[in-house]
């Protein structure tokens, strides 16, 4: 029995000693956050069910190693206020999404790699001197600005549904995915992002987009902007391009060898130029003002939606993989389907 009691006492002493080793500055900053009011009644400490703020090792979602916080996972805990995590030297991961936090400072965190504060009410976030940060998710907040100048390894950035007017990530050579949809962007700068593969910038107020030096782009979505003229050329890796709802009058897609899906519906296009895109399998150019459309010799094209235009002529000759065509609500008198050996369905009602 004495041996058992001794072991228990030793364990308690070890835990107490471990808790006491936590960096004093980190402990002070966490305690300051705990005393702030939570989204609902009580404090953030109450929301996290913290009974003893001096025993931080026991706080749920807080990982401490060698006297330093290495991870914070407080998703959907009804937290609120300002969270200062600056100078947490060993902090690698932060997930405080789905709360009501208004500002976060994670500056000077050399080990931080993954940061998620989406679905809060953030008006400010500080990423200064976070050299290891590769993933940032701050979508659905109230941010008007974000500085990424000292985040050299960033690969994935989601800032969608914020209040940006301008966003500049030019020459971010490690960036692979950028989602900035649903903001108020009038100016987006991505030139020189040589490794960018996925760009989602729909539902903004963009009037133009410069893709110079973005040659590895695979997926591009510029839905619901104000771009009237767009030429997409020389993007050899591009596989999906969506540009619907843009008031677009001119669209040219050229020399995109791997392009598979093209969606440019609900614009004001009178002509559509698709050159050097031999691997197209799906085209949706419905609800435009096209008077003629030549998509012949696209041997991989399987589905074509060109309904609700002003087409007089439609040429899909020698599209040997073509299975379905919807060309309803046009004025087609010349429809060319020579060599379309797999064509199974043509929806062509209301052409007159």
Report the location of each language-model feature:
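Canonical leucine-rich repeat
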Residues: 82-83, 104, 125, 146, ...
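N-terminal capping/linker segments that flank leucine-rich repeat
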Residues: 2-93, 110, 131, 152, ...
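Leucine-rich solenoid repeat scaffolds
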Residues: 333-352
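Leucine-rich repeat
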Residues: 66, 88-91, 109-112, 129-133, ...
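Conserved hydrophobic beta-strand positions in leucine-rich repeat
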Residues: 70-72, 94-96, 113-117, 136-138, ...
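Right-handed parallel beta-helix
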Residues: 93-122, 128-130, 135-140
């Amino acid at each position: 029995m004495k041996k058992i009691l001794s072991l228990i006492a030793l364990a308690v002493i070890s835990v107490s000693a471990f808790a006491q080793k936590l960096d004093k500055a980190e402990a002070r900053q966490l305690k300051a956050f705990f005393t702030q009011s939570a989204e609902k009644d009580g404090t953030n400490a109450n929301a996290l069910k913290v009974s003893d703020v001096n025993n931080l090792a026991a706080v749920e979602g807080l990982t401490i190693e060698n006297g330093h916080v290495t991870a914070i996972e407080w998703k959907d805990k009804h937290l609120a206020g300002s969270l200062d995590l600056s100078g947490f030297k060993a902090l690698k991961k932060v997930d405080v999404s789905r709360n009501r936090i208004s500002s976060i400072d994670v500056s000077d965190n050399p080990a931080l790699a993954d940061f998620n504060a989406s679905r809060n009410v953030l008006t400010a976030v500080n990423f200064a001197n976070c050299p290891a940060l590769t993933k940032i998710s701050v979508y659905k907040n109230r941010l008007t600005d974000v500085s990424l100048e000292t985040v050299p390894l960033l690969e994935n950035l989601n800032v969608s549904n914020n209040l940006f007017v301008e966003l500049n990530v030019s020459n971010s050579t490690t960036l692979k995915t950028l989602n900035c949809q649903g903001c108020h962007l009038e100016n987006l700068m991505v030139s020189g992002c040589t490794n960018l593969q996925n760009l989602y910038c729909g539902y903004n107020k963009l009037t133009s987009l410069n893709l110079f030096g973005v040659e590895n782009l695979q997926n591009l979505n510029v839905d619901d902007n104000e771009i009237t003229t767009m030429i997409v050329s020389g993007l050899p890796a591009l596989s999906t391009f969506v540009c619907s709802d843009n008031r677009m009058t001119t669209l040219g897609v050229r020399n995109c060898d791997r392009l598979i899906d093209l969606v440019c519906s609900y614009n004001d296009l009178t002509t559509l130029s698709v050159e050097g895109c031999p691997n197209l399998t799906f085209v949706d150019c419905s609800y435009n003002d096209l008077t003629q459309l030549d998509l012949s010799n696209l041997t991989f094209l399987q589905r074509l939606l060109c309904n609700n235009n002003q087409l007089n002529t439609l040429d899909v000759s020698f599209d040997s993989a073509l299975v379905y065509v919807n060309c309803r609500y046009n004025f087609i008198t010349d429809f060319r389907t020579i060599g379309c050996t797999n064509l199974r369905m043509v929806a062509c009602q209301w052409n007159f």
